[in-house]
Curated annotation (Swiss-Prot):
Pathway connected to this protein: Cofactor biosynthesis; coenzyme A biosynthesis; CoA from (R)-pantothenate: step 4/5
Subunit structure comment from the entry: Homohexamer.
CDD domains associated with the record: PPAT
Record's protein name: Phosphopantetheine adenylyltransferase
Catalytic activity, reaction form: (R)-4'-phosphopantetheine + ATP + H(+) = 3'-dephospho-CoA + diphosphate
Underlying gene: coaD
Provenance organism: Bacillus licheniformis (strain ATCC 14580 / DSM 13 / JCM 2505 / CCUG 7422 / NBRC 12200 / NCIMB 9375 / NCTC 10341 / NRRL NRS-1264 / Gibson 46)
UniProt keyword annotation of Transferase present: yes
Keywords linked to the UniProt accession: ATP-binding, Coenzyme A biosynthesis, Cytoplasm, Magnesium, Nucleotide-binding, Nucleotidyltransferase, Transferase
Any GO BP annotation: coenzyme A biosynthetic process
Localization per Swiss-Prot or TrEMBL: Cytoplasm
Annotated site (Transition state stabilizer): H18
Broadest EC class assigned to this enzyme: transferase
GO annotations of cellular component type: cytoplasm
Family from the record: Belongs to the bacterial CoaD family.
Amino acid sequence: MASIAVCPGSFDPVTFGHLDIIRRGAKVFDKVYVCVLNNSSKKPLFTVEERCGLLREVTQDIPNVQVESFQGLLIDYAKSKQANVILRGLRAVSDFEYEMQGTSMNKVLDENIETFFMMTNNQYSFLSSSIVKEVAKYKGSVAELVPEAVEAALEKKFAKNERP
């Protein structure tokens, strides 16, 4: 049986921390679906389509990664892809507490889908999309935090005086 993972997130925008988890996950699993979720509790800077486009651009060199979007329950998306794993990145203990709730709910919805936690590399342990947007908003350099395509997209967004 092929190992198929779903790596969900809002990716607003995708950072080197996200890419670290995606790349490492692609070495562990036969197929990784990167699923851009529309989180109704967040006001995104980039549209779902823009986020998918950026993710496709920065993962095009990883043959077993496919980027898609989904609205609804993550567990339903995972089942539709015949995934047996949900791949999640952790930066700190606070991430674990949040992720534990989601994992427990997913187990109630489908006990056959496992959650696989992967710690980010230390150099990305502080990194979040929110931090990236805040730095970019005030014209700080995000070159060490995001791929070039994302940096350019952020510059374009904030040149229009759009706010995160």
